[in-house]
Amino acid sequence: MGKRPVKEALVGDLQKLLEKSSVVMVIDYRGLSVAEITGLRRRMREHGGTCVVAKNTLMGVATRETAWRNIDPLLAGPSAFLFGNEKLKEMLKTYEDFARETKKTEFRGAVVDGTLVTLDGLKAIADLPPKEVLLAQFAGALKVLPTKIAVGINQVPTKVAVGINEVPAGLARVLEALRKQKEEQQQPQAAA
C-alpha cells in the first residue's frame, strides 16, 4: 500500500470525526510524551471527546470546502485536535486541567460550528445553558410578548383619555392664573 491511499484513509477518518463534532479545539502538543498524549486521549474519551494527532496538511485537506475551513489559521506547528460534541464544558475543563498539570501545551484556538473562536470565546460558549434550556427560554419570551403588546395597546386609549381630560383642566388653571394676575395688576393701578 502506497502513501497516497494511507493519507486518503486518514483524511476520511478526520472527515468522519468532523461530521460528528460541533467543536474542534487545536492545541500545540510540543514537548508532550507519548504517555501524556495517551492520558489526554483517555481523559477526552471519558467526556465524549476524541484527541487526534494529525498532520496539519491532512487536516487542511479534510476541512477544505466545508464549514470547518476556518481552522486553517490554527494549522501551524505540531498540532493535536480535540473533537467534541455535547459535553463542551467538561472537555474544556479536562483540557485546562491537563494543561495546568503538564505546563507543556498551548491552546491555539477552536472552531465551533464553523466559527473560529479564542479560548475566552470557547469558555463563554461553554458557560451557556444547554440548547434545550435556551429554546425553552426563547419560547417563554415569545409566549409573553403578545400579552405585553395587548396590555400596551389597552393602555393607549386610557392614556389618551387621561391626557384629553387634563387639557381642559390645565387650560382652566392657566386661565384662572391669568385672571388673578390681571386683577393684581389692576388693583395697584386703582390704589394709585
UniProtKB/Swiss-Prot annotation:
UniProt keyword terms in alphabetical order: Ribonucleoprotein, Ribosomal protein, RNA-binding, rRNA-binding
Molecular functions (GO terms): large ribosomal subunit rRNA binding; structural constituent of ribosome
Cross-referenced InterPro entries: Ribosomal_uL10 (IPR001790), Ribosomal_uL10-like_sf (IPR043141), Ribosomal_uL10_bac (IPR022973), Ribosomal_uL10_bac_type (IPR047865), Ribosomal_uL10_CS_bac (IPR002363)
PROSITE patterns in the cross-refs: RIBOSOMAL_L10 (PS01109)
GO CC field: cytosolic large ribosomal subunit
CDD domains: Ribosomal_L10
Subunit structure, interactors included: Part of the ribosomal stalk of the 50S ribosomal subunit. The N-terminus interacts with L11 and the large rRNA to form the base of the stalk. The C-terminus forms an elongated spine to which L12 dimers bind in a sequential fashion forming a multimeric L10(L12)X complex.
Purpose: Forms part of the ribosomal stalk, playing a central role in the interaction of the ribosome with GTP-bound translation factors.
Protein known as: Large ribosomal subunit protein uL10
Organism this protein belongs to: Gloeobacter violaceus (strain ATCC 29082 / PCC 7421)
